[in-house]
Curated annotation (Swiss-Prot):
Glycans are attached at N67, N105, N229, N440. It is found in: Cell membrane. Pfam families: CD36 (PF01130). The gene is SNMP1. The keyword Membrane applies. Residues 513-522 have a biased composition (Polar residues). It is a multi-pass membrane protein. GO terms for cellular component: cytoplasm; plasma membrane. Belongs to the CD36 family. Disulfide bonds join C268-C333, C297-C352, C335-C341. Principal component of the olfactory cilia membrane. Detected in both male and female antennae but not present in leg, abdomen, thorax or head. This is Sensory neuron membrane protein 1. Residues 500-522 are annotated as: Disordered. Plays an olfactory role that is not restricted to pheromone sensitivity. It comes from Bombyx mori (Silk moth).
Length: 522
């Protein structure tokens, strides 16, 4: 028995609506997910791989120095007063070199190189980099603090070494041009014949701490970032490609061939998270991201804060901080023991970089209130000093990022050194940096064209199929049962119903149908 034409149309329309529903909510998401898994992996053919190897645009790198306005008083034990000078703006170009793949275990080995270009026109008003900054002598204080930690009985010898190398300084501060301490370098005179300074310089040359360049005539050149600029980092990083499992993309599995560090205690020695330049797709606000920082020898675990948007693209904002090592069980393994953790918001980097430095959020944001009491001139503000990253959740692409960190040092107080005996002994700020990313219009358009435009087109087509299919079913059903509907309507019109008046009089009222005489009222 063949179906009537209207029912055929209804069946076809129903199929169209069903196909639209299935394609829009089942088939297309599966296709998109499958395609994203291929595109987000670090295989040679993907655009993500090309951008991962060499970011095709510069990152914002801003440095803020703290100028000490009462250095002479601090030398006598006064609370330091600081004034922030900055930003000194640099373009930061990132590239990975000596890239080697291992398809068998789905990994890539690489080294990295960073290039910094100073842009005075984008720096703070009037800043040229030639400004003289008064700040603690980092090299001098590092020498004293290292001896204090490693061999405190040798502080007297360290005092003689400092006097010999720095020509009997009157205080622990240096007066230095901004670009000199940042990149160009300041000269450390190791051309000494006295025992203490000569022994100290020999040790320095042997251990070759970060930031040191060896010059002729026993001279050393020290800067904060000069050694890193346009130089290949010697460490070999191994990460997952994500071809076999896209959720592993960029995950650090080894550095210099070692699958764990030998720096901290227990689980803190594990490499957890990506290398910070790529993240897995399909993020939800419940996901806890992880990235590993080789500079700080630790992983960070940003958490979801709120939903945001960037250039019309919906994003999720994640935030992070340094943490409270004493009260967070996950972080206590960064301390020698739970009762020897630094104050909230501080991390001791000595074991990581072999230099007595502490890191915190800028202006001690979210740190122990005592840190702010020990320095005047700081004004922590979450908007200006917090760590935040806005991710496009489907692809896991960072759209906007502000990674901020402050470096601090202790003004060591010690009776064994005349230069240190009156210092306040507190931890004070040196400088803070902001590494920023804002995906430019070119790559925003690329993301939209590859991800969101197809999604919207498919969504519109599917809704049209569902709408027209549903309307087609309704119309076909109505058309098919049109005769029955009309018959019922006619039958209803030809019927007479009696209505009983409100009073009990013997009256009848008829309702007039077709070809019927008017009813009489009795």
């Amino acid at each position: 028995m063949q179906l009537a034409k209207p029912l055929k149309y209804a069946a076809i329309s129903g199929i169209v609506a069903f196909v639209g529903l299935m394609f829009g909510w089942v088939i297309f998401p599966a296709i998109l997910k499958s395609q994203l898994k291929k595109e987000m992996a670090l295989s040679k053919k993907t655009d993500v791989r090309k951008m991962w190897e060499k970011i095709p645009f510069a990152l914002d790198f801003k440095i803020y120095l703290f100028n000490y306005t009462n250095a002479e008083d601090v030398q006598k034990g006064a609370v330091p007063i600081v004034k922030e000078v900055g930003p000194f703006y640099f373009e930061e170009w990132k590239e990975k070199v000596e890239v080697e793949e291992n398809e068998g275990n789905d990994t890539i080995n690489y080294k990295k190189i960073d290039v910094f270009l100073f842009k005075p026109e984008l720096s703070g008003p009037g800043l040229t980099g030639e400004e003289v900054i008064v700040m603690p002598n980092i090299f001098m204080m590092a020498m004293a603090l290292t001896v204090y930690r490693e061999k405190p009985a040798m502080l007297n010898v360290a005092a003689k070494a400092i006097n010999g190398i720095f020509d009997s300084p009157s205080d622990v501060f240096m007066r230095v041009k901004a670009l000199d301490i940042l990149f160009r370098g300041i000269i450390i005179n190791c051309d000494r014949t006295e025992f203490a300074p000569k022994a100290a310089c020999t040790t320095i040359k042997k251990e070759a701490p970060n930031g040191i360049v060896f010059e002729p005539n026993n001279q050393l050149r020290f800067s904060l970032f000069g050694v890193r600029n346009n130089s290949v980092d010697p460490h070999v990083v191994t990460v997952k490609r994500g071809v076999q499992n896209v959720m592993d993309v960029g995950r650090v599995v080894a550095i210099d061939g070692k699958t764990k560090m030998n720096v901290w205690r227990d689980s803190c020695n594990e490499y957890q998270g990506t290398d910070g330049t790529v993240f897995p797709p399909f993020l939800t606000h419940k996901d806890r991201l992880q990235s590993f920082s080789g500079d700080l020898c630790r992983s960070f675990k940003p958490w979801f804060q709120k939903k945001t948007s960037y250039n019309g693209i919906k994003t999720n904002r994640y935030v992070a901080n340094i943490g409270d090592f004493a009260n967070d069980p996950e972080l206590q393994c960064y301390c020698d023991s739970p009762d020897k953790c630094p104050p909230k918001g501080l991390m001791d980097l000595y074991k990581c970089i072999k230099a007595p430095m502490f890191v915190s959020m800028p202006h001690y944001l979210e740190g122990d209130p005592e840190l702010l009491k020990n320095v005047k001139g700081l004004n922590p503000n979450a908007k200006e000093h917090g760590i935040e990253i806005d991710f496009e959740p489907i692809s896991g692409t960072p759209m906007v990022a502000k990674q901020r960190i402050q470096f601090n040092i202790q003004l060591l107080k010690s009776e064994k050194m005349d230069l240190l005996k009156d210092l306040p002994g507190t931890i004070v700020p040196l400088f803070w940096i902001e590494e920023g990313l804002s995906l430019n219009k070119t790559f925003v358009k690329m993301l939209k064209s590859q991800l969101f435009i197809p999604k919207r087109v498919v969504s519109v087509v599917c809704w049209c199929m569902i709408s027209f299919g549903s309307l087609g079913v309704i119309a076909a059903v109505i058309f098919h049962f049109k005769g029955d509907i009309m018959h019922l309507a006619v039958a209803g019109d030809n019927s007479v119903s009696k209505i009983k008046p409100e009073n009990d009089e013997n009256k009848e009222v008829g309702v007039m149908g077709q070809n019927q005489e008017p009813a009489k009222v009795m």
